[in-house]
Amino acid sequence: QQPQGGRIINNGSVSAHVPRPGSAPYTSTKHAITGLTRSISLDGRKFNIACSQIDIGNAGTEMTKRMSEGIIQASGDIKKEPIMDVSHVAKAVYDIAELPLNTNIQFMTIMASSMPYIGRG
């Protein structure tokens, strides 16, 4: 195809790295996105296609609303979790999209700073 080139930005999740209790279907699909991102990155090289993945944690959407109200933790406790403004994710996507095709951010994690990610459980 002419012209060639482009950029794909996949939507991952911190849950692929540190799952929540009872989240096997969601976690496994987000883990699969990592394999997809790596495969597209490799196969896309000859077509000048760059592929990135953003692993998102606790961005303020309808899906995450329950986290600020309290969600089950690995310990079995229900705890409220911090939420970040989803506009920060949009800015990160924009910044990746603006890169020249000879430059790539392969993987990025963006999350509420104090969410239980490091040391989850």
Residue ranges: model-predicted function:
Residues 42-45:
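Alpha-helical segment proximal to the catalytic Tyr-Lys
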Residues 26, 34:
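Catalytic tyrosine of NAD(P)H-dependent dehydrogenase/reductases that use a Tyr as the general acid/base
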Residues 22, 55-68, 121:
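Short beta-loop-alpha junction of Rossmann-like oxidoreductase domains
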